[in-house]
Curated annotation (Swiss-Prot):
NCBIfam families: EF-G (TIGR00484), PRK12740.1-5 (NF009381), small_GTP (TIGR00231). The gene is fusA. It is found in: Cytoplasm. Its main location: cytoplasm. InterPro entries: EF-G-like_DII, EFG_II, EFG_III, EFG_III/V, EFG_IV, EFG_V, EFG_V-like, G_TR_CS. The keyword Cytoplasm applies. This is Elongation factor G.
Length: 691
């Protein structure tokens, strides 16, 4: 089976936006006009094709990124739907990894919102070329020009305006195409499928000329020869302009800005044209960086069917009909059903069973997938999010994704005995799909604890457990994920001896325990020379410390940011074993922790509140009362932005306080920043609660 679409005709794009900016509606319209869905699904009725999980339909927010493929002007567009809520930024990051370009959707009334900035910064991190679509031009208070200003002031980007709106709010009837210098006006009765080009009306001519000139001036900077000709009075034609805008977009010198109203079916087709004209094909983005697992040397893969196979698994979903589906982006080579591949991240083999190409609501079985494709593979046993699949003879590990640590936890208990077993299965499935979600069982109380990125994140996971797996559970109040660490250095020399007829147990270890840098986690080093502890026993020493560090001596929280160095030891030819060294290092750690002293750490969140000026004093006062430290304030348009670091323990239920304090006008976002020592009074309180 040969490749159907040339690689240069692929566009792998994501649609990024703040909640409610109209991302799902925009995606729906794209699928409608590219001929995939026959009836437009409205998010308002909860029937959009992209939002295929029941919950998303109820909450009207998009949670899982479904990958959909469609065609426009003979180009294949693969759309990865990204979630827009801050609790799901991990999914956004993951989808940004596999995109080549993105369309950022803004609400023309709200402009650039906090979450849009978060997502924009993530897209900068992965160097994703993007364009902007200013949506909802038909709403009261729509203001395209203010939105363009905010792209400069809030995102620090350079907007290249390629369209102007004709009218706004109820008067919004179409756009001026600044490349063709013509109006595009839609016929209402044809659901936006029909539109016509007309001459620009006289009253808008002056403004159109002004913006056209600005656009040309920015575009010609991409090519010296065109620039010279332009300065001599020769204006570039439309085809040349498109080439220059494409070049500037892909090199991230500027972002094309378009406008429309997806809900009113206006502006979607020109946006699709812009995706094809300005966003890169897999051939135009940087080669994928990776590491050769055999040599640990850097290696790369380019978009070509002839290079060795390299594939990134970026999402796992459970499908009621097919079971577990792993969404994959093929960077190089060809993947065929029935063949074996290497999961280089975990160093084990996988067999490619069934491959599916996902359309908005149906799926098509395929036998081969080529470089640039995004496919879903059924039945992979050990592959999780972020793993690389590759040619076993030419292995590569594509750059690893970094997942933030979960900071909030709740205890969940099944309501009935029957739910008990189902809950275990459900939680494991969910943890497999979402690396920012962890499940653990408290050894002492036997309680199951789930950990995630925020209150909404955990709400949704519990909800999915109920719907998808039919598990009813009681959920405790959210708890803070405290940690413990050492306060100073301690050196422990410990000997473990046990003699009971026959062979006994013997191990002696001398270990230095010391505090590490913040964020360093747990480090283990062996400085054994001359074999005072044989090589094969050293992993036992490390394992011993690891087995007890998850339950600290102070209040039973995991210990972080410390280092254990094995300095010396002794063994016995008959009585020593890995087990004996494990027991010795465990006891040494307990003694060391006691001697070094242990302190309690709490997660500090980076909080950003955007509020109208008049509530600023109240907001700052309230943050201070939550043990918050204000790190700065800035003016953003008419609003004030307050940056603060606040302990997570004091942020529960903050959203309600903020709403009532600002009459619903202020919003906030928060993400984990670092761990910090807890004040003594709070530490005593936490320990008393646990006791």
């Amino acid at each position: 089976m040969a490749r159907k679409t040339k690689l240069e005709d692929y566009r792998n794009i994501g649609i990024m936006a703040h909640i409610d900016a109209g991302k799902t509606t925009t995606t729906e319209r794209i699928l409608f006009y590219t001929g995939v869905s026959h009836k437009i699904g409205e998010v308002h009725d909860g029937a959009a094709t992209m939002d295929w999980m029941e919950q998303e339909q109820e909450r009207g927010i998009t949670i899982t990124s479904a990958a959909t493929t469609c065609f426009w002007k003979d180009k294949r567009i693969n759309i990865i739907d990204t979630p827009g809520h801050v609790d799901f930024t991990i999914e956004v990051e993951r989808s940004l990894r596999v995109l080549d370009g993105a369309v950022t959707v803004f609400d023309s009334v709200a402009g650039v919102e906090p979450q849009s900035e978060t997502v924009w910064r993530q897209a900068d991190k992965y160097r994703v070329p993007r364009m902007c679509f200013v949506n909802k031009m038909d709403r009261m208070g729509a203001n395209f020009y203010r939105c363009v200003d905010m792209i400069v002031t809030r995102l620090g980007a350079v907007p290249l305006v390629t369209q102007l709106p004709i009218g706004s709010e109820a008067e919004f009837e179409g756009l001026i195409d600044l490349l063709k210098m013509q109006e595009i006006v839609w016929k209402d009765e044809s659901l936006g499928a029909e539109f016509e080009y007309r001459d620009i009306r006289p009253e808008l001519k002056e403004q159109a000329d002004e913006y056209h000139a600005k656009m040309v001036e920015l575009a010609v900077e991409m090519d010296d020869a065109v620039m010279e000709a332009y300065l001599e009075g020769n204006e570039p034609d439309e085809a040349t302009l498109k080439k220059l805008i494409r070049k500037g977009t892909i090199s991230r010198k500027f972002v094309p800005v378009l406008c429309g109203s997806a809900f009113k079916n206006k502006g979607v087709q020109p946006m699709l044209d812009a995706v094809v004209d300005f966003l890169p094909s897999p051939l135009e983005v940087e080669r994928m960086q990776g590491i050769d697992p055999k040599t640990e040397e850097p290696d790369t893969r380019g978009a070509s069917d002839d290079e060795p196979l390299s594939v990134l698994a970026f999402k796992i979903m459970n499908d009621p009909f097919v079971g577990s589906l792993t969404f994959c982006r093929i960077y190089s080579g060809v993947m065929t059903t029935g063949t074996g591949v290497l999961n280089s991240t975990k160093d084990n083999r996988e067999r490619i069973g069934r491959m599916l190409q996902m359309h908005a609501n149906h799926r098509e079985d395929i036998k081969e997938a080529y470089a640039g494709d995004i496919v879903a593979v059924a039945g992979l046993k050990n592959t999780t999010t972020g793993d690389t699949l590759c040619d076993p003879l030419k292995p590569i590990i594509l750059e690893r994704m970094e997942f933030p640590e979960p900071v909030i936890e709740v205890a969940v208990e099944p309501k009935t005995k029957a739910d008990q077993e189902k809950m275990g299965i459900a939680l494991n499935r969910l943890a497999q799909e979402d690396p920012s979600f962890r499940v653990s069982v408290d050894q002492e109380s036997g309680q199951t604890v789930i950990k995630g990125m925020g209150e909404l994140h955990l709400d949704i996971l519990v909800d999915r457990m109920r719907r998808e797996f039919k598990v009813d559970a009681n959920v405790g109040a959210p708890q803070v994920a405290y940690r413990e660490t050492l306060t100073k250095r301690a050196e422990i020399d410990y000997t473990h001896k046990k003699q009971t007829g026959g062979s006994g147990q013997f191990a002696r270890v001398k270990i230095v325990f010391e505090p590490g840098e913040p964020g360093s986690g747990f480090q283990f080093e062996s400085k054994i020379v001359g074999g005072s502890v044989p090589k094969e026993y050293i992993p036992g020493v490390q394992k011993g410390v690891e087995s007890v560090k998850d339950s600290g001596p102070l209040a039973g929280f995991p210990m972080i940011d410390f280092k254990a160095t094995l300095m010396d030891g002794a063994y016995h030819d008959v009585d020593s074993s890995v087990m004996a060294f494990e027991i010795a290092s465990r006891a040494a750690f307990r003694e060391g922790a006691q001697q070094a002293g242990v302190k309690l750490l709490e997660p500090i969140m980076k909080v950003e509140v955007v509020t109208p000026e008049e509530y600023m004093g109240d907001v700052i006062g309230d943050l201070n009362s939550r043990r918050g430290q204000i790190s700065g304030t800035e003016q953003r348009g008419i609003a004030q932005v307050i940056h603060a670091n606040v302990p997570l323990a004091n942020m529960f239920g903050y959203v309600n306080t903020l709403r009532s304090m600002s009459q619903g006008r202020a919003q906030y976002t928060m993400q984990f920043d670092h761990y910090e020592q807890v004040p003594q009074a709070v530490s005593d309180e936490v320990r008393a609660k646990l006791a």
